Amino acid sequence: MNPYHRPVFQIVELNPYAPRPYVFTEAASCLRDSIRLAGYACSLRNNEADPRGISIVLGAWQFGRTMVEALDRNRTIIFNLEQLGATDAFPGKPYEDWLRERIVFDYHAGNIERMATTAGGRSRFFEVPIVPTPSLATSGHAPSAPEVDVLFFASESPRREEIVRRLQAAGLTIDWIRGGAFGTDLAPAMIRSRIVLNVHYYQTRLAPSTRMLQAAVRGVPIVSETSVQTGRCDWSRSGVLFADYDDVVEACRTLIDSPERRLQSVQRTLHFVARLEFALAFEEAITALGFTTAYDTGHFASRNLFS
């Protein structure tokens, strides 16, 4: 039997709270689903990896960068979901320096451009979109009639607090989950809300793809502060209603006051998601990295990265 086969991938979510969902859980699920739809075998693992496999790691810097060193760098891809270049951004320059030594997939072209100029080239940095997939809506929570006008799941900042005050002054009801919620933990709040809101924390204002995922799949309209879009996943072409900071409250009112507009928003977003092209970006990246060549996929043991 020929021991060489098409490459097999594994999404490695570093999550100190597993099996509860956390920051990267939704993105990890969508990546697994998208890679499978592209025609490749792909598993999703929490806090462990097959050391001879091709790993795509989420949360490496935050929850286990030392542990990730146990993996072969030439078979390990770091998926960056942070906003690079913001003066107040976590985790800042040390993280960028760490990324320069690795293979990186990134959700946004703005981050790629920054790394290309500061790292002297882009040969190991690739834009790969996070595409919403139906698995995010299979949490077992049945749809219900909306009870809350605005769902806002985010950490606190003065500009966000000001928007919440303005929404309340406009007579809107708000469910602000401070610090955020994720995956199945977010689902109950999602299904009882008329709209989901995004207001930026960092001045880079990169379009927050991960904040769109579950709302897009569950059919909840989204209002977002104006964002810097990216070529492979330009949410301005969807039904998301973008507005400048001072116009966010009015944008929320526009959707909340009109069930017809909310329906149109959802339909446009679902159409947009259905047309997003993941496979091409993924194939281009793994071909450039040489991962489409045959390699041994014989049995090997998993390594727990938190042990």
Where are these regions (language model features)?
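Short, charged, surface-exposed secondary-structure boundary motifs
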Residues: 86-93, 114, 134-140, 162, ...
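A short, charged/proline- and glycine-enriched loop
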Residues: 2-9, 50-52, 142-150
